[in-house]
Amino acid sequence: MKIMSVNSGSSSLKFQLLEMPQQEVIVSGLVERIGSNQAVFTMKTKDKKDKQVLEVLNHQTAVELLLDALIQKKVINTLEEIEGVGHRVVQGGEIFSDSAVLTEKTLAQIESLCDLAPLHNPANIISIKAFQKVLPQVFQVAVFDTTFHQSMPAVNFLYAAPYYWYQKYQIRKYGAHGTSYKYITEQMQQILGKKNAKIIICHAGNGVSLCAVDSGKSVDTSMGFTPLEGVPMGTRSGNIDPAVVKFIAEKENKTVACVIDDLNKKSGYLGVSGISNDTRDILANIKEGNQQAILSHDIQVKRIVDYIASYYVLLKGVDALVFTAGIGENSSFFRSEIIKRLSVLGIKLDEEKNKVQGKQELITTFDSAIKAFVVPTNEELAIAQDVLRLQQNQTNQDKDDQQECFCCCG
C-alpha cells in the first residue's frame, strides 16, 4: 500500500510517498516559501528531479499542487492509490503516549496543545486539515515528536519550579526528535540482538539533542519544555541561566519575546562564531584556524559530552553510543572530538571506520569498552510504519467487533 509521510512547517511542506511494507520510496519532495509568489516546489523520483518556482499562497494550495503533480507525472494514476497519510506533529503533550488516528476529537486535542508549541502545532494542524479536505476518505495519523519520551519518570521530566506550574500549565520536559529516537532504538535492538539494550543516542543536525534509552524506553533527553533546552545547536543557545533573559531585555531595551527569539535564532554556532549556523561552514573555518569557530564547536562538544557522561551514570553503563542525523551521520570530526573526550569510559575510536558518511557502521575498535555506531535515521519511514501499524490495528479491531456482533446476534 502507498503511504505518504508529511512534515509541515509554517512556510514549508516536506513529503515522501512510500510503498509499504516494502519500505520503498516512490517519490519525495518539498514545497518551500509557502505564502509567496516565489514558492519553490521540488519533486524527486528515482530517475528524475523537477524544480519549479510558482505562486503558492497557502498550505491548501501546496497540498493540491503536490497531489496533482503525482498524477501528472504518472507516479500514481488516481488519488485512491494513497491509502494512508502520516503527519509529523511536534507536540503531543501528556495526552498522547503513542501515534494517533486523526479524528475530530484527536484534532481538537492537538489544537488544545498549541500553547505548548505555538511555532509548530498550528502549522501541523493547517497541513492536516488541507490533506483531510483533499483526501477525506483516507486513513490519516498524527505521529508526535514527544510520545517516545512519555516513558520518562517524573524525576527526569519535572523542573524544580513551583509544582502548580506543572499542575496548571503542564510545565515539564517533553523532549523532541522522538520519531528519530524510536526508529534508531528499534534499529539498535536488531543490531545488538537484545531488547533490553542500554543506548545513548546523539541526534545531531541543525537541531541537536541526546536521549538515554533503556530496554526500548526513553529514560531522559536533553531538550525540554521546548527544543531550546539542552546543548548548543545551529542557532539555539541550549541551556542558559534564565536570569540572562531579563538582564538582556533591560540592557538592550528588548521584550522578553525578542530575547527568546535571539536565543532560538541567533545563538549556538551562529551566535558564538559570528559566521554561520551550518556545520560545514564552521568546520571549514576551524581548518583555517578561526578561533571563534573553534570555540563555538568546542562549547557544543563539551556540552554533548556532559550529557553522555550523565546518561552513562543514569543507565549504569551502556551497550552502545549512537550518532545519527545530518552531522552525526556525516561529520567524522564531530564524532572524533566527542569520543576522544570520553576516553575515561574506555571507549576507543577506529579512525579508519570513523571516516564513514551516511551509512551504518561500527566506529570503535574491537577492544573498546563501549561500542559506538553511526546509524542513519529515517523519520519518514518511521512515520509510514506507524500509519501501517495503526491501520492494521484498526482493521483487526473492526474484524473482532464484527465477530463479536455475529456471535451475539447468532
From Swiss-Prot:
Top-rank taxon, per record: Bacteria
Site positions (Transition state stabilizer): 177, 236
Entry keyword set: ATP-binding, Cytoplasm, Kinase, Magnesium, Metal-binding, Nucleotide-binding, Transferase
CDD domains: ASKHA_NBD_AcK_PK
Subcellular location: Cytoplasm
GO molecular function, one term: magnesium ion binding
Subunit architecture: Homodimer.
Function: Catalyzes the formation of acetyl phosphate from acetate and ATP. Can also catalyze the reverse reaction.
The protein's name in its UniProt record: Acetate kinase
Species assigned in the record: Onion yellows phytoplasma (strain OY-M)
Origin organism lineage: Bacteria, Bacillati, Mycoplasmatota, Mollicutes, Acholeplasmatales
